[in-house]
Amino acid sequence: MDGFASIWPSSRSQVDGQSIGDAWVCSSLPTSPPAQLWESIVPFHKLTQWLCYSIMVPMSKLMNIHFAGSDLLTGLPEYRNGGLLIDMGLLTLKEDDLQRGLNAFKENAQIRGQPNVEVVPLFSAEDDVIVEWRAITVGFLDELVDEVNGQLGLLGEDQLTLAQMLEAGSWKVGSLADNQLRCWFDSILICLFLFRAVVKLQRSPDQTQKNHRL
């Protein structure tokens, strides 16, 4: 990961003066001091891991390359996987966080040029709500792949890998659920201040400060 340090914004989380990219402080974790600084940071690196998942299969099959530690890659905490947990009712916002997000959305809606969409809770990428949502998504994806393999009766080498479950399962179903539950293309369940290094976003040419789903 050291090779990516130069492209990660210096305004994000840092350890020993080094930018660490898609990794965010969470107040639920031990604080520094007495804990070490890194103990309060949740690492995601969604896009980096997505890239790894994408190139590993062809490189393994066509070039016979072995990737050590590939089992340490995690589920991807993005809006199709995380949104599925919300759309299926597994996760809900706490009432005080919901109200805080709605208030933030209404305040932001007063900015000229914002799109006219339904009122939904709005948070910045570093907000504990978003960090915890993404972290919980990673954890539940591990549980989900085990459950899917169990329900399908798959054992040993026949078991689906996490990457296979993500591509054909949670990511696919999350995308379908999103399309079916929301009646128009840009409809959203939770709004996120624009951070291009965190999520892949849809953006019109005249946007200056827009908000998008995780």
Annotate the PLM regions.
Residues 97-117, 121-122, 126:
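Long, intrinsically disordered, low-complexity Ser/Thr/Pro-rich regulatory/activation regions
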